[in-house]
A protein has these predicted regions:
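Flexible, membrane-associating and regulatory peripheral segments of lipid-active enzymes
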Residues: 1-38, 43-55, 61-64, 239-250
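Proteins with a high burden of low-complexity, intrinsically disordered sequence enriched in S/T/G/P/A and R
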Residues: 8-25, 92-100, 104, 114-118, ...
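Serine-dependent carboxylesterase/thioesterase catalytic core
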Residues: 34-40, 47, 51, 55-67, ...
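Helical cap/lid subdomain of alpha/beta-hydrolase-fold lipid enzymes
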Residues: 112-250
Length: 250
């Protein structure tokens, strides 16, 4: 049961970099928009990110969701290498990254171990198990034979997570980590919190948000926050009065 949940569903203090409007927006020197590379989660389903990707494209942003090896259940470092290849294919300039669920961990491996921090402007993580998830921990304990490589790597205290959490936000990009208090897969939900990132629980802005883990990439509030972040807009001071505007932006 635990493995089924994992395979289906996993497909602090804010820093000032996103606390105020910035000159470092999601645009190239020539005024064009930076390409966005999206990284799917455990299970590797690109369909889970299609609505968000299509929204970005409608706004004139070149957006691509990568295919990860091993259906997203294999070695997350191999997925990070696939991400590095995808970024190189966008050309020599900077890019923005969006990592959903385990895809957020893949993005962080690329940033911290493969030199990606030098190429990336904005990093947006959606429900990322940055410090592991209890679901994976239980799977390792009780269903080890069914727990794929990525599953073991997502257990709290894994060697991989310990390695990338030595420096949770390597210098270079701006980091935004979003999560929902209603997350039933990445538990506890605030395992998504990162030192040096702008950390946002959806319900801290919109208490009525009932977004689950699987709904994060399709949620209108999440999309509104992602769009604002990629534009380099301020996220400080957002509250319940901004919910309608954020959702309408999607």
């Amino acid at each position: 049961m635990l493995i089924a949940v994992l395979a289906v569903a996993i497909v602090a203090v804010p820093v000032v970099r996103w606390a105020a409007a910035r000159d470092t927006t999601g645009r190239r020197v020539d005024g064009g928009r930076l390409p966005v590379v999206l990284v799917p989660g455990y299970g590797g389903s690109r369909a889970s990110l299609e609505q968000l990707r299509a929204t970005l494209v409608r706004r004139g942003i070149q957006a691509r969701t990568i295919a990860v090896p091993g259906n997203g259940t294999g070695d997350l470092r191999a997925s990070a290498r696939a991400l590095a290849t995808a970024v190189e294919r966008t050309g020599p300039g900077p890019v923005d990254l969006i990592g959903y669920s385990a895809g957020g961990v893949v993005a962080r491996i690329y940033l911290g171990e493969l030199g990606g921090a030098a190429r990336v402007r904005h990093v947006v993580l959606l429900g990322a198990p940055n410090h592991g998830t209890k679901v994976a921990e239980l799977a390792v304990q009780f269903r080890a034979a069914e727990c794929a490589v990525a599953c073991t790597q997502l257990a709290p205290g894994s060697a991989l997570l310990d390695a990338i959490n030595g420096d949770e936000t390597p210098d270079g990009p701006d980091y935004l980590s979003l999560w929902t208090a209603k997350d039933e897969t990445v538990t506890p939900p605030d395992t998504a919190r990162l030192d040096g990132a702008y950390n946002v629980e959806l319900q801290s802005i919109c208490p009525d948000a009932a977004t689950t883990h699987g709904e994060l990439p399709r949620d209108r509030l999440v999309t509104g926050l992602v769009l604002r972040a990629l534009d380099g807009g301020t996220l400080e001071g957002l509250g319940e009065g901004d919910c309608a505007t954020l959702r309408a932006a999607a």
